[in-house]
Amino acid sequence: IIALSVFVTELLSQMTLEEKIGQLNLPVVTSEIVTGETLSGNVVSLIRAGQAGAVFNAAGYETVYGLQKIAVEESRLGIPLLFGLDVIHGYKTCYPVPLGLASSWNMPLVEKVGRISAIEASADGINWLYGPMLDISRDPRWGRCVESPGEDAFLNGAYGTAMVKGIQGELRSDSEILSCVKHFALYGASESGMDYRETDMSPERMYNVYLEAYWEAIQAGAASVMASFNDINGTPASADEWLLNEVLRNQWGFDGFVVSDYNAIREMSVHGLGDASEVSKRAITA
């Protein structure tokens, strides 16, 4: 049996630069996404060429397993894909929205919802759930309050811990899949409750209120984190080295991976932070 670290090192040594960059690519398989542009190229061609490391929004056994078969059997190195999906309040079985579920204060029930959601999603080949969403939301004008456990830092932290444990378990079986804590950070505190807007906040308020729930989910073992759309004190979260490196990795000890939210890297360019090369560099080095 080859040690995982040895296997990964050997695999990396075989990869071209294009294939390594391709592992950072997360194409979408449907045009039914309303946030920004969707992929214009052929997803199957990208997978065959080793130009995709994960796929977003693939749903259904036939689609997921068909794409995974192409990745494993037809790409040069046969690296399997991650399949990410937003599962807000259940995959096949529909549960109360997070705001309602959290209001029960029943954390064993929250964990069970996460467990069943993971079991159902994994049966279709999904191995990466985009949740829990732990944005403190105190402005009712913000349109995504319903996805959050609410306004209380303690409750959000307890909810996040339970959901991470439910989704991931011990990550030892096919039905124990990756969670993704989002949206890091302060997404629910955007100016005037307007989505994507800037967030102006002191470090004291961040640490005492808004960062607590994310931290608790990380301590519970969350495997991945999604950076938020908003900027924080003038810096977009997706390119915020202080947030993603100093806080998340150095202070909190997070050793998983970070994913940008939908189209967030391209949007940094649209918002004037530089061309595609510049904003990509800022995101990767953050």
Model-found features: residue ranges?
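Glycoside hydrolase catalytic-domain context in secreted enzymes
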Residues: 1-286
